[in-house]
Amino acid sequence: MAKFKTNHFTSLQGSKEIIRTNGMKYTVRQNRFRYFFPDEWMTFYDALSSKQKVTFNFLINTGARINEVRNVCVQDVDFDRNSIIIKWTKARNEDGSRKMRVLSVSPQFIKWVRATIKEYELKPADHFPILSTPAANICMKKTLRKINIPDWLMFSVHNVRKTLETWLISLDVDSLKVSKHFGHSITVASKFYVSPDTFNFEDKRAIRDIIGELYYHQGGFR
């Protein structure tokens, strides 16, 4: 049975039921800002199947939304410059077209992408085998429950995006680079993401083990 370090989220578990004026009921999470601590992520990732790992490795290494990742083709990966072009984005240009975003990724992730392309025999125009959003959310909750994360209900795939941004901030990566990477303003980042003091030295070393040399040469923690 996995045993995790105590963290400040343990008192923010649970959900509450909301009743609409039409009588319909739905539930909302008490804590929508949950992110993974590195020991939680490593245990979660190790419990996934090989196919499931493709989705979640893309998410944690890019910080992209799952719909953005699902629309990435092999030809969108720049193997020489360690970057990925995101063409299907949430942000729009004035003419209504989607605003393209280029994401830096680590050389370690690029190496993994090459191996994945070979394993699945993908061609330049092929998409990567990314799970649907409902399937990814179900997979995440089932796996987190299996590995005994007490507040597993607080997670959705979007929390992986929150996790990478939180990690990069904790590593003291330049805030402008972080905001450009995730496609939102520094104000949004400071409002919804945590301070660098959340993680200790051991946590930060573990984060580097997970995300490799992503923004490694931009100063901050190494």
Feature annotation, model-predicted:
Residues 90-92, 182-207:
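Catalytic-site neighborhood detector that most strongly recognizes the C-terminal catalytic loop/helix
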Residues 38, 71-112:
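Conserved tyrosine-mediated DNA breakage-rejoining catalytic core shared by Y-recombinases
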Residues 46, 121-126, 138-180, 187:
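Short, basic (Lys/Arg/His-rich) helix/loop patches that form interaction surfaces
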Residues 24-66:
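Basic, Lys/Arg- and aromatic-enriched nucleic-acid-binding interface segment
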Residues 2-21, 208-222:
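C-terminal secondary-structure termini that scaffold catalytic or DNA-interacting sites
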Residues 76-79, 173-194, 221:
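Short, polar N-cap/turn motifs at the start of nucleic acid-interacting alpha helices
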Residues 2, 59-81, 176:
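Short, charged phosphate-coordinating catalytic segments
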Residues 92-115, 122-142:
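C-terminal catalytic core of Y-nucleophile DNA break-rejoin enzymes
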